[in-house]
Amino acid sequence: MNIREAIAAVVARRDLTQAEAASVMEEIMSGTATPAQIGAFLTALHMKGETDAEIAGMAAVMREKATHVYFDGPVIDTCGTGGDGAHTFNISTTAAFVAAGAGLTVAKHGNRAMSSVCGSADVLEGLGVQIELDAEGVARCLREAGIGFMFAPKFHPAMRFAGPVRREIGIRTVFNILGPLTNPARARYQVLGVASAALAEKLAYALSRLDTVHALVVHGDGGVDELTLSGPNLIFDVRAGQAPRQMLVAPEDVGLPRAPQDALRGGDVAYNVAIVRAILSGEEHGPRRDVVLFNAAAAMVAGDLAPDLATGVAMARHSIDSGRALERLNQMIAVSRGE
């Protein structure tokens, strides 16, 4: 199916198969499709609503077109789709260091802030990490620090064809949700935070169509794209060859007290950097530390390091209290800067 045929189909509200969506994405990412065709397709797809098959087909092509990071061993990604408007501090980024301190190899894929003041790239840069590394630089971080960061614009050169169109049409499109599915290090383990419950289910099924080994897709209480402390969280457990399993998990189920969402608010880069350092150094106790423990625990489970979230919380606590989480941050800073 070519993109003109796909536009006609989607305008008529017909869902594309995974193979058809992949074929269209191939045209977009090879520069064959015109800007007008890309804009029409993205808008029509958004209005129809993307299916898990369409998302998976497009993600598979975007993965292939990425600049790959090669690492000999399993890696996990912790990220969110963003767009929740909650303005929390950088929870998943902090949790990534805690997960690395517990023994996982974390290949984090992210960008600068889109809907918040301070995105993962912004806070890492503020902490002293050199974020614009090439594939070999990231691989070195994975080998020597147990955690690396792939700055999305550097690793998706084929996005240059769709990027200007996305900016010009100014609406959220399927590309806003493809980023977390297209890790250049081919992470087959993942924690994916999603701000919408309906989209969380859709992305769980999309991941089950890809080569995922184990992932947790999480939707926080109140519409947040990470596990939170204010109430029950929706989790989809995705394992290779199985339909996603849905569950509700409240903080007290894993031994953590509830806290209002306002207790997790972040600020500008300097403010968030101070929070991350205070948590990783063990100085901070309270809701901000607790929410990091919760989200790091999800990584332990998705990475098959912990059998359940309660055990994961205990492992996360030890990662911080032993100094290993902070050590991972300091190692990442040094390795990324060539020191």
Swiss-Prot record:
SUPFAM superfamilies: Nucleoside phosphorylase/phosphoribosyltransferase catalytic domain, Nucleoside phosphorylase/phosphoribosyltransferase N-terminal domain. Catalyzes the transfer of the phosphoribosyl group of 5-phosphorylribose-1-pyrophosphate (PRPP) to anthranilate to yield N-(5'-phosphoribosyl)-anthranilate (PRA). This is Anthranilate phosphoribosyltransferase. 5-phospho-alpha-D-ribose 1-diphosphate binds at residues 80, 83-84, 88, 90-93, 108-116, 120. Its cofactor is Mg(2+). The gene is trpD. Homodimer. InterPro entries: Anthranilate_Pribosyl_Tfrase, Glycosyl_Trfase_fam3, Glycosyl_Trfase_fam3_N_dom, Glycosyl_Trfase_fam3_N_dom_sf, Nuc_phospho_transferase. Anthranilate 2 binds at R166. The keyword Magnesium applies. It comes from the Bacteria. Mg(2+) 1 binds at S92, E226. It catalyses: N-(5-phospho-beta-D-ribosyl)anthranilate + diphosphate = 5-phospho-alpha-D-ribose 1-diphosphate + anthranilate. Keywords: Amino-acid biosynthesis, Aromatic amino acid biosynthesis, Glycosyltransferase, Magnesium, Metal-binding, Transferase, Tryptophan biosynthesis. It comes from Chloroflexus aurantiacus (strain ATCC 29366 / DSM 635 / J-10-fl). Belongs to the anthranilate phosphoribosyltransferase family. It is an enzyme of class 2 (transferase). One of its GO terms (cellular component) is cytosol. Its EC number is 2.4.2.18. Binds 2 magnesium ions per monomer. Anthranilate 1 binds at G80, N111. Signal peptide: none annotated. GO terms for molecular function: anthranilate phosphoribosyltransferase activity; magnesium ion binding. Mg(2+) 2 binds at D225, E226. Pathway: Amino-acid biosynthesis; L-tryptophan biosynthesis; L-tryptophan from chorismate: step 2/5.
